[in-house]
Amino acid sequence: MVVNIGLYAFKVTCEQQLTSTIDSIYGDASAPDNPADFEVKVVSPSFLRRFIRPQMSFYCDQHSPFKPLPASQAYAILEWGMNWCIATHDHTRLLVHAAVLVKNDQAIIFPALPGSGKSTLTAYMALSGWSLYSDEMAIIDLKSGLVSPLYRPVCLKNDSIDLVKKWFPDSVFTSTWKDTHKGDVAHLKASSWSRYTQYTPTEIVAVIFPKYILNSDLNIYSLNQLQAFETLSKNAFNYGVLGRLGFNVVNKIIKRAALFEIEFGDLRDVEAFLSEDIIK
């Protein structure tokens, strides 16, 4: 089967039981216009591992970048493997580990470390009317500095899974994969293909580094350009490979974007700040 995520397409070989989960997330996407960019497999690493403590491995062109995982985590390893393919092979764009949300044709990127609450924030905003361009990766044009959308789900972990289900009971989730190296994981379908096709490359108006703190008020800290440059470039998968091209596009972004770090305990406070103070 072919998985179309917009900018990239994956030809996926996998066990039959995995295809239903893939269809629940990507089944409404149209067939890509061009051949697949990547050929990947999620299969058992050996015949015995199909039956004794079943495991699955991810392969891209016969290369397996991860250790085998329990077969119950097959969909999770597919999503992580797709991220790996893009981050490792596409050096025609700047790729930043960040969420991207858009409103009124204005993009905000949220680079963040694990545990920052980035994906919970992304899910909440995407299901509250914002356009989801990405949960995991900002795809930025090297010349224009515009950020492009990907058709991907939101990866939620641990307590945030039940929180989002409580806030949005009609939302579409995969099963929850227990005890992965990231904890309990589930993927949320936060958009539709028909909506995705309306998205276009968009200017980045703000770079915001979020950090969730239980019961915290919203604390907002302005960053200077040097601070933002250092942190944004460190969050880029291929900044070092791009050399001067990477430097130039990061420099372009921080010169024209609002730059903040925020601490938050209530997502409604974040939404109010973004809608009232960032988006025009």
Task: Give the ranges of each region predicted by the language model.
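Charged, amphipathic alpha-helical linker segments immediately N-terminal to NTP-binding catalytic cores
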Residues: 41-85, 264, 277
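Glycine-rich, often acidic-flanked micro-motifs
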Residues: 4-24, 33-37, 87, 99, ...
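Conserved lysine of the Walker
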Residues: 118
